A protein has these predicted regions:
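A short, structured beta-strand/loop element
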Residues: 38-39, 44
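Conserved histidines in hydrophobic membrane contexts and catalytic metal-binding motifs
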Residues: 27
Length: 95
């Protein structure tokens, strides 16, 4: 899935994200780099409003995956591995 495909569905994706407490949604990984293949997942980097839990994050990933028809991995900046965080934050593109 290419980034421009996600952008065309931006409002729908952000509506789902907001319903699960996401206040910022970015795309990273192969989709952001333009190297995604037909079976690639979509990686989302989100910031959650205060009081949201891991359950919200998991539910968001499932709903985004169902909406896109492919696996959606969702993580937060604080959950990024320190050795990968700088690269991921640099390539992340706002939805």
């Amino acid at each position: 899935m290419e980034l421009d495909e996600l952008v065309t569905r931006r409002e729908e994706l952000l509506r789902v994200a907001r319903a699960h407490g996401a206040v910022s949604v970015r795309v990273f990984g192969s989709t952001a780099r333009g190297t995604a293949g037909p079976s690639s997942d979509v990686d989302f980097l989100v910031e959650l409003e205060s009081g949201r839990t891991l359950l919200d994050l998991v539910a968001l990933g499932r709903e985004l995956g169902a909406l896109l028809g492919r696996r959606a991995d969702v993580t937060t900046p604080s959950a990024l591995h320190p050795l990968l965080a700088k690269r991921i934050l640099a390539e992340a593109r706002p939805l």
